[in-house]
C-alpha cells in the first residue's frame, strides 16, 4: 500500500475522501473488488478514530455491524481486537431484537482499523485536504477526480465523500465557537461550497459529546458496578474468542442539584442560547435536552466507561453537553462519585452541513453528479455503525461503476443496511437518523445471528468478499444446511418423545425435530436424548437450529411478504418519466414524484402521502409505456 510519503499513481479507480468509519469501510470495500483505491484524509494517524463514544453496536446498531462483517467489512474484526466490556442487550427477549454491544479500548480499535487498511491490496493512503472536485465539461457532468488544498490533482472514475462532521463544521462550547470538524482539526469548506454549486437540498445538523474525566479523580468505590458478560461474544465470524481482559464500568446519576445547575445556565448552552440551529439526534439527547424535555424526572443514569486498559480517560455516557466548561465541572461535581472529578477535555456540540439523502440513488450515487457517492453523516445519519454500513455500500458501488458494472443494492427484506438506505433515499431526514430494530418490517428474518447466511453469498457475487471469508462461511453454511435438512427429516413418534419426558398429543403423528426444537429451553435438553446427533453439533449451528425451529412458522409468512416487496422493487422507474402525463395523480403526489424521482415502484410506494390508487396509476403507466430504466 502506498502512503503519503511514498510515490502514488496520479490516477485511481476510486478515491474516498475521509478516514472515519464510513471512509474506512468504503476504501476497504472498493479495494477488495480489485479497484485501485485511494483514501484521502487530513491526517493518516487519525484514521479509525472513535470521535465520540468508545463503543460499537447496540440495539439495531449491532445488527448493522454483523451485516458489515458478513460483507467482509472492517468494523466487526476491529472491535473484536479492542473489546474490553461486552453485553448482549435484550438478551432476555427474542433473538430478533438482541443487540450485541462492545466497549472498546480506543487506541486498540484505531490500531486494528489501521492495521487492516495497511494490509489491504490495491489501497493507498494520501494525506491532504480535498477542496474541490474535478468534473467533465458538457451538460451532463461526471466526476473525474479531486483537487487537494496543496494543488495536487488526483483523477478517478468515481469519488466517495465521507466527510462526517467536517463539512463546514463548527464546534460550540458555551459561548465559545470555533470552526472545526473535530477538536483541533480544520473543517472542510471548499467541498461544502462545491456542493452548494450543485444546487442540492442541504441543511444543518448537530451532534454532541460529553466531557472526558480523569479516572484517578473518580471515587469508584462509592459507585455501583456495571459488569459485562465474560466471556464476551465476538462480532466477527472470523473470530472464535476475544483475548483482551474484560473490565467493569460504574454507574453514577444526575441529582436535583445537577438539574438546577443546568436550568440556571441554559441560556449559556449553545443549543438553548440560540448559537446554533442544527437539529440534534432524538435518541442521543444532550443533558440539557433531558432536563428540559423531562422536567418530572429527578435523575438520569450516567455510565462511566473507561476508554482503554492503560488510559486514564473516562467517558461519562449520558451527559453530552454544550454548556461552558466551568458549568460542566459544576454539574459533574454535583453527581455521586464525581465530587472531585477532573475534566480532561470539555464536552461540546458540533454543527455541520448534510445533503438531503433523497438526492441519492439507492446505490448512494448522487443523482445530480454521476460518479459521486456520499456516505455517513453527510447523508444525515448518526453513529459509527450507520456510517460504516453506508460506506461499505458506497465503496462497493463506486468500484463497480469504475469497473463498468451495474450497481448493486440490498432491499428492506434482505438487510438492515437495505432498510437504512431505503429510509434515507425515500423519506430523507429531519434529524440525525439512527437505526433501531423497529424500523424493519422483517426483523424476525433480519437477525444479528444470521447476517452471514443472509449476506455473505450476496457479497461474494457482488465482489466484496475475500477468499478467506468465503472459505469460512462456506464450511459453516454447509454444516447449517446439513443440520436443517436432518432436523426436518428426522422424526419421532409421540410415544418415543414421551419416553424422554416430552409431552405432545398422542395422535400417532411423527414429529420432525425442527417442529420441536427452540420452543422451550428445558425441552431442548430432553431432545438430546431423543436425537443423540444433537450432541455433535457445533454450538453455533445448534443455536441457529433452535432459532430456526422457534421462528419457523413466522418465517414462512415473512417470506411471502418479502416476495411482494421484491416484486415492486424490480419495477424500475426512469429518470425521464413525465409524471404530469399520468392521470389520476393529485397535485401533491405529482410534485413529490417530479422532485424526488423514486427509482422503483417499491420506492414510490413508500413515499409519504402515496395512495394505492396513485400507485396503481403509476404502475399502469410504466407498464403501458415501458418506461423502465
Curated annotation (Swiss-Prot):
NAD(+) binds at residues 280-294. Its main location: cytoplasm. The keyword Cytoplasm applies. Keywords: Cytoplasm, FAD, Flavoprotein, NAD, tRNA processing. SUPFAM superfamilies: FAD/NAD(P)-binding domain. Coiled coil: none annotated. PROSITE patterns: GIDA_1, GIDA_2. Its cofactor is FAD. One of its GO terms (cellular component) is cytosol. It is found in: Cytoplasm. It comes from the Bacteria. GO terms for molecular function: flavin adenine dinucleotide binding. It holds the Pfam family GIDA. One of its GO terms (biological process) is tRNA methylation. InterPro entries: FAD/NAD-bd_sf (IPR036188), GIDA_C_N (IPR049312), MnmG (IPR004416), MnmG-rel (IPR002218), MnmG-rel_CS (IPR020595), MnmG_C (IPR026904), MnmG_C_subdom (IPR047001), MnmG_C_subdom_sf (IPR044920). The keyword rRNA-binding does not apply. Homodimer. Heterotetramer of two MnmE and two MnmG subunits. HAMAP family: MnmG_GidA. Belongs to the MnmG family. PANTHER family: GLUCOSE INHIBITED DIVISION PROTEIN A, PROTEIN MTO1 HOMOLOG, MITOCHONDRIAL. NAD-binding protein involved in the addition of a carboxymethylaminomethyl (cmnm) group at the wobble position (U34) of certain tRNAs, forming tRNA-cmnm(5)s(2)U34. This is tRNA uridine 5-carboxymethylaminomethyl modification enzyme MnmG. It comes from Granulibacter bethesdensis (strain ATCC BAA-1260 / CGDNIH1). The lineage of its organism: Bacteria, Pseudomonadati, Pseudomonadota, Alphaproteobacteria, Acetobacterales.
Amino acid at each position: 500500500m502506498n502512503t503519503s510519503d511514498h510515490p502514488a499513481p496520479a490516477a485511481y479507480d476510486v478515491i474516498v475522501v475521509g478516514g472515519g468509519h464510513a471512509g474506512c469501510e468504503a476504501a476497504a470495500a472498493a479495494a477488495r473488488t480489485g479497484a485501485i483505491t485511494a483514501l484521502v484524509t487530513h491526517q493518516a494517524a487519525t484514521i479509525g478514530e472513535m470521535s465520540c463514544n468508545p463503543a460499537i453496536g447496540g440495539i439495531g446498531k449491532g445488527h448493522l455491524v454483523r451485516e458489515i462483517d458478513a460483507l467482509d467489512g472492517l468494523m466487526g474484526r476491529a472491535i473484536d481486537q479492542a473489546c474490553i466490556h461486552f453485553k448482549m442487550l435484550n438478551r432476555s427477549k427474542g433473538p430478533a431484537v438482541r443487540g450485541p454491544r462492545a466497549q472498546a479500548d480506543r487506541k486498540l480499535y484505531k490500531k486494528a482499523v489501521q492495521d487492516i487498511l495497511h494490509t489491504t491490496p490495491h489501497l493507498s493512503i494520501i494525506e491532504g485536504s480535498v477542496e474541490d472536485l474535478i468534473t467533465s465539461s458538457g451538460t451532463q457532468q461526471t466526476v473525474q477526480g479531486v483537487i487537494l488544498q496543496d494543488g495536487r490533482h488526483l483523477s478517478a472514475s468515481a469519488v466517495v465523500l465521507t466527510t462526517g462532521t467536517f463539512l463546514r463544521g463548527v464546534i460550540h462550547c458555551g459561548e465559545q465557537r470555533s470552526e472545526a470538524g473535530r477538536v483541533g482539526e480544520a473543517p472542510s469548506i471548499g467541498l461544502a461550497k462545491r456542493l452548494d454549486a450543485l444546487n442540492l437540498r442541504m441543511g444543518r445538523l448537530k451532534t454532541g459529546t460529553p466531557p472526558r474525566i480523569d479516572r484517578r479523580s473518580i471515587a469508584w468505590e462509592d459507585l455501583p458496578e456495571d459488569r459485562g458478560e465474560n466471556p464476551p461474544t465476538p462480532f466477527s465470524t472470523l473470530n472464535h474468542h476475544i483475548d483482551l481482559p474484560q473490565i467493569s464500568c460504574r454507574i453514577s446519576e444526575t441529582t436535583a442539584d445537577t438539574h438546577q445547575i443546568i436550568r440556571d445556565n441554559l441560556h449559556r448552552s449553545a443549543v438553548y442560547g440560540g448559537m446554533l440551529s442544527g437539529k440534534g439526534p432524538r435518541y442521543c439527547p444532550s443533558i440539557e435536552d433531558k432536563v428540559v424535555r423531562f422536567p418530572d424526572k429527578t435523575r438520569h443514569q450516567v455510565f462511566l466507561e473507561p476508554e482503554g486498559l492503560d488510559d486514564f480517560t473516562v467517558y461519562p455516557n449520558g451527559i453530552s453537553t454544550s454548556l461552558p466548561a466551568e458549568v460542566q465541572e459544576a454539574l459533574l461535581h454535583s453527581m455521586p462519585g464525581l465530587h472531585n472529578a477532573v475534566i480532561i477535555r470539555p464536552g461540546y456540540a458540533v454543527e455541520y452541513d448534510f445533503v438531503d439523502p433523497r438526492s441519492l440513488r439507492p446505490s448512494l450515487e448522487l443523482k445530480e453528479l454521476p460518479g459521486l457517492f456520499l456516505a455517513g453523516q453527510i447523508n444525515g445519519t448518526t453513529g459509527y455503525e450507520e456510517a460504516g454500513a453506508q460506506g461499505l455500500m458506497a465503496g462497493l458501488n463506486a468500484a463497480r461503476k469504475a469497473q463498468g458494472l451495474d450497481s448493486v443494492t440490498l432491499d428492506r427484506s434482505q438487510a438492515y443496511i437495505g432498510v437504512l438506505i431505503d429510509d434515507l433515499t425515500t423519506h430523507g431526514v429531519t434529524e440525525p437518523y439512527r437505526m433501531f430494530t423497529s424500523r424493519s418490517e422483517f426483523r424476525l428474518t433480519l437477525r444479528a445471528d444470521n447476517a452471514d447466511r443472509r449476506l455473505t453469498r450476496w457479497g461474494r457475487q457482488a465482489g466484496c468478499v475475500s477468499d478467506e471469508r468465503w472459505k469460512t462461511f462456506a464450511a459453516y453454511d454447509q454444516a447449517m444446511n446439513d443440520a436443517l435438512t436432518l432436523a426436518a427429516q428426522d422424526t419421532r413418534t409421540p410415544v418415543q418423545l414421551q419416553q424422554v419426558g416430552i409431552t405432545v398429543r398422542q395422535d400417532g403423528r411423527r414429529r420432525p425435530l425442527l417442529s420441536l426444537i427452540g420452543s422451550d429451553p428445558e425441552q431442548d435438553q430432553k431432545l438430546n436424548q431423543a436425537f443423540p446427533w444433537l450432541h455433535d453439533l457445533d454450538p453455533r449451528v445448534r443455536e441457529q437450529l433452535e432459532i430456526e425451529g422457534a421462528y419457523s412458522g413466522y418465517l414462512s409468512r415473512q417470506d411471502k411478504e418479502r416476495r411482494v416487496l421484491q416484486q415492486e422493487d424490480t419495477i424500475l422507474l426512469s429518470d425521464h418519466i413525465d409524471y404530469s402525463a399520468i392521470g389520476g395523480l393529485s397535485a401533491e403526489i405529482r410534485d413529490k414524484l417530479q422532485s424526488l424521482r423514486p427509482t422503483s415502484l417499491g420506492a414510490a410506494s413508500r413515499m409519504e402521502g402515496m395512495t394505492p390508487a396513485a400507485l396503481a396509476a403509476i404502475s399502469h403507466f410504466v407498464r403501458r409505456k415501458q418506461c423502465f430504466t
